[in-house]
């Protein structure tokens, strides 16, 4: 099963741009939003140093990572590989 971990923070400008794009895809992709300020352990676990960041998991394993604002199509391509 595929899942995207979406790392963001309330103070992050680019995250505010990516947030609505991710929300618009909620029926098409499986994702979980993770606040880096309140979930530092997850940020460390997945090596997140810049946000916004997307980590693609497949069967619990990291398959790919992207950093920065992506378009809806780019996210769908990232997810569907």
What does each model-identified segment do?
Residues 1-25:
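Local sequence-structure signature of Cys/Sec-based thiol-disulfide redox active-site neighborhoods
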Residues 2, 28, 52:
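Alpha/beta-hydrolase fold active-site loops
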Residues 7, 22, 26-42:
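Thiol-based oxidoreductase modules, predominantly thioredoxin-like and allied folds used
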Residues 56-81:
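Non-catalytic, surface beta->alpha helical segment in thiol-disulfide oxidoreductase systems
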